[in-house]
């Protein structure tokens, strides 16, 4: 199993919708059983600029993390689909153990 996480800006869009929504829809269409989007309350990126949830941050500068737990085949299919759209999306793919106790 893999944890596939995408780190995007809340202002990023694709196909006339927020990118986090598009990622969730595309994963669902491939048969991924679930996914979640999480909005950051604060952070900084590669340029070192601090972003926080304040009145002045209403321009959509905060990060959104979209993640899925899926097998290798689905992870590869989702990544390939995203590559086919020539997007600039940072991701992490980690091997994880998942279960229910």
Q: Which residue ranges define each predicted feature?
A:
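Positively charged, small/polar-rich N-terminal and surface patches that mediate targeting and assembly
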Residues: 1-101
């Amino acid at each position: 199993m893999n944890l596939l996480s995408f780190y995007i800006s809340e202002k990023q869009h694709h196909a006339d919708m927020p990118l986090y929504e598009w990622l969730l829809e595309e994963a669902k269409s491939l048969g991924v059983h679930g996914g979640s989007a999480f909005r950051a309350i604060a952070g900084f990126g590669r340029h070192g600029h601090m972003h926080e949830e304040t009145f002045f941050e209403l321009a959509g500068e905060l990060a959104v993390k979209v993640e899925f737990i899926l097998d290798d085949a689905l992870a590869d299919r989702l990544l390939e689909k995203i590559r086919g759209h020539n997007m600039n999306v940072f991701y992490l793919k980690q091997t994880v153990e998942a279960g229910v106790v």
